Amino acid sequence: MNSLLIMGYTSFDLGIFNEKDIKVSIIKKTIRRKLINFLEEGLRWVIFTGNLGFEYWALEVAKELQTDYEFQIGTIFPFETHGQNWNENNQIKLASFKQVDFVKYAFEAYENPGQFRQYNEFLLENTEGSFVFYDEENETKLKNMVEKMKQSSNYEVYLLNFEDLQEIFEEMND
């Protein structure tokens, strides 16, 4: 696989409001393992959409892994205005999404809901697979995108769920 889209729950979805929360370290450990597997299989591009939570933690891990693996990181934001109303702490995280190898904006500004459909289609057409933190028992707005991913032919979907995280947590405590 050449390019991998990373998406998942936001920190708000997960009820995580402190970066020092133990859940963050469990999630990051899981991300690290999975990304290393992808990279050792020849992954060349990791693509983000600029969301807080899972994506941001994956971005941090990916940036750390760039010291040992040769791959590119890209962020394709839906709009140039993405994150403009975020607080100061989150603005720092937004800046981190912009300090990667490739940054593009699908649209200048929001005009209509159809832009999200076009944006999602673009992401699916320009990546070969996805690594998504999503559990079908805990639905969010990611549901439609995950369904589109699964329906796309020749598109690999790797889902991370809460059960996977529980296994990592138990491993850490052994």
Swiss-Prot record:
Disulfide bonds: none annotated. NCBIfam families: PRK13660.1. This is UPF0398 protein LACR_0544. InterPro entries: YspA. Belongs to the UPF0398 family. PANTHER family: UPF0398 PROTEIN SPR0331 (PTHR38440:SF1), UPF0398 PROTEIN YPSA (PTHR38440). SUPFAM superfamilies: MCP/YpsA-like. Pfam families: YpsA.
